[in-house]
Amino acid sequence: MSLVKLYDTTLRDGTQAEDISFLVEDKIRIAHKLDEIGIHYIEGGWPGSNPKDVAFFKDIKKEKLSQAKIAAFGSTRRAKVTPDKDHNLKTLIQAEPDVCTIFGKTWDFHVHEALRISLEENLELIFDSLEYLKANVPEVFYDAEHFFDGYKANPDYAIKTLKAAQDAKADCIVLCDTNGGTMPFELVEIIREVRKHITAPLGIHTHNDSECAVANSLHAVSEGIVQVQGTINGFGERCGNANLCSIIPALKLKMKRECIGDDQLRKLRDLSRFVYELANLSPNKHQAYVGNSAFAHKGGVHVSAIQRHPETYEHLRPELVGNMTRVLVSDLSGRSNILAKAEEFNIKMDSKDPVTLEILENIKEMENRGYQFEGAEASFELLMKRALGTHRKFFSVIGFRVIDEKRHEDQKPLSEATIMVKVGGKIEHTAAEGNGPVNALDNALRKALEKFYPRLKEVKLLDYKVRVLPAGQGTASSIRVLIESGDKESRWGTVGVSENIVDASYQALLDSVEYKLHKSEEIEGSKK
């Protein structure tokens, strides 16, 4: 099958999303990752529109990319200004990109109301701008803004705008669903009509306002489109752009279209999480293909089936996109879940062992009280080890006390925790302050234990979530605390439940520390 070229606009269109902004250094790092995975075109921004994009195009020239081409984005010339005098077009050329992509008006409504020029003059803007760029830049793409809405309003004029781009020898004409409202059945019909009039290579750029961006992109490829534009994780204005993390595996694995290599596809999940990290956003665990839950199984019947034949409940092998099968533990679990988790944790367990059923019943009883182990697998691993008698007790907490004090109305509250622990035959009694009672307790616990276990200095509390459970009444409701901790090697989650938020936090903190000590001991043991 013919090659479908991938055009990424995360660094420009993706940054128009609410709460997303990248430093120049971030954009350079993302560009390298996009290049590694095999993206053909990387749109870096709009030169001249802001200092950040100016700096990007200056700095990216110093970088060595293996195959990706850098694209600069802009608009057609202004009315009543010749291309060689137009600041926007001159700035595009001065940025020295591999590709220039400019957008122009397709919808007669926009021509009249936004540009306030005649329809004929708009055609001249499109032709003149593209012709000028073609004489100065290796490749030129034309984004037909609002094409599908424009076609529905005035099909003859919409086609004329594409013909103007074709006459100017644009290397690819990109049909844009800018408002994101076009349905797949409409898109297919319109592209078929376009192909009766336009012979130039066509691309597709869709937005997700109707939850159809990925579907529309794939339908477009089926209709002969050769370039697909989108963003990593679907970042973009309003509801986002077409998600390349869904489009790429669908093209390659479902539609058998050439786009990137097998080894590159296996880096897809890593790329997704890398971009989330630089955007300072938590990954969407329910995201197709690359999310943590994309291949997660909770029901016991499902788990039993996938252990024999993964395809029973997985539409493809997760390893193909760099993901993995996960077995969740909950009150829906069966023995298969427990055994699968034991195997994951390298814990030997027999399916006929009564302890398996005991663990299962314990989980159901604990979840009835409000515990949840999907995000707290470290707590679950410790639960299994305790049931099997393989849990080593590194220390015991004799008691603790937490004091919150506010001395003056205009001052911050003071939090102090006092704790007494026993390690072997030695007792350690210490105190620590913190930013709130939980932080104070965390500091005191680790302060008491670090002299015995120095490796605890590596641990940091990364995330802390509190949820009031609905079963209780008013202030007497139970509270579930989920804590994520980590060191330089890994991250792990623990859980605690109580009517008292400090006690629930204490349970989760205790599991976090114990898990770290168990893992450190296992690593040290494997080195001997």
Swiss-Prot record:
Reactions this protein catalyses: pyruvate + acetyl-CoA + H2O = (3R)-citramalate + CoA + H(+)
Residues in Pyruvate carboxyltransferase domain copies: 4-266
Pathway(s) per entry: Amino-acid biosynthesis; L-isoleucine biosynthesis; 2-oxobutanoate from pyruvate: step 1/3
GO biological process, alphabetically ordered: isoleucine biosynthetic process; L-leucine biosynthetic process
Keyword Lipid metabolism attached: no
Enzyme Commission identifier(s): 2.3.3.21
Top enzyme class: transferase
Top-level taxon of the source organism: Bacteria
InterPro entries, A to Z: 2-isopropylmalate_synth_dimer, AIPM/Hcit_synth_CS, Aldolase_TIM, Citramal_synthase, LeuA/HCS_post-cat, LeuA_allosteric_dom_sf, PYR_CT
Family designation: Belongs to the alpha-IPM synthase/homocitrate synthase family.
Protein purpose: Catalyzes the condensation of pyruvate and acetyl-coenzyme A to form (R)-citramalate. Makes part of the main pathway for isoleucine biosynthesis in G.sulfurreducens, i.e. the citramalate-dependent pathway.
Descriptive protein name: (R)-citramalate synthase
Organism of this sequence: Geobacter sulfurreducens (strain ATCC 51573 / DSM 12127 / PCA)
Taxonomic lineage from the root: Bacteria, Pseudomonadati, Thermodesulfobacteriota, Desulfuromonadia, Geobacterales
Chain's gene name: cimA
